[in-house]
Regions:
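A charged, solvent-exposed segment within the mature domains of Sec-exported extracytoplasmic proteins
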Residues: 129-191
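Short helix/turn-capping signatures at newly exposed starts of structured segments
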Residues: 2-139, 178-196
């Protein structure tokens, strides 16, 4: 005696096999992220991986150029709070999350800050990835505005990672890594200004 599946079961199974992945790709956050990264990769956007916990101000511009040689860096000397030189590169994917630009800042040839501009609809996924990689953030920092936005901060061995807890309206979707030297220098300047 041979066992045969009824025709209706076969059809339902085929429908699930064909449409299940399509529905997952279209209607789940993870599926949409994977679809976005695949499309970005197909269109030639660069994918990079960067361990934010291991970043330090010991890295030089030449070392980062060598590690991320596939990126087309556009560099400019410009003195600001983050350094005296910055380089910008267009990217498509950062640690598996769709992104737009990566900006690195240098002072005296050493890395002081990294700014990642990502796609706003991937904010929660990037935040979730940071929670997994860096653990729970420290107490949110309150900004000095009438409507304070909470900024999440994670301490790393050599710096601080900052990201808004939630994006509102025209907020720029960005993540910052600041070197310990830059953070302590900024705090020292702020305390001097506060005592004047």
């Amino acid at each position: 005696m041979t066992y045969r599946l009824p025709l209706i079961y076969k059809k339902l199974l085929i429908l699930c096999v064909v449409f299940g992945p399509i529905l997952w790709l279209m209607f789940t956050e993870d599926g949409q992220r994977r679809t976005d990264t695949l499309v970005l990769w197909l269109f030639g956007e660069e994918e990079i991986s960067m361990d934010l916990a291991a970043l330090s101000n010991q890295y030089t511009e030449q070392e980062l150029d060598k590690v991320y040689a596939q990126l087309k860096w556009h560099c400019q000397d410009h003195v600001d709070a983050y350094g005296e030189r910055h380089c910008v590169a267009r990217i498509g994917i950062f640690n598996g999350i769709p992104a737009r630009y990566l900006t690195v800042f240098y002072r005296d040839g050493r890395l002081t800050a990294v700014k990642l501009q990502y796609r706003a609809h991937n904010h929660d996924q990037l935040q979730s990835q940071l929670l997994t990689l860096l653990g729970e953030p420290k107490q949110p920092v309150q900004t000095n505005t009438e409507d304070p936005d909470q900024v999440l901060q994670w301490r790393t061995h050599f710096g601080l990672v900052l990201m808004k807890q939630a994006l509102h309206g025209n907020d720029e979707p960005a993540l910052l890594w600041l070197s310990s030297g830059l953070v302590s220098g900024t705090l020292a300047t702020a305390s001097k200004n506060a005592t004047k």
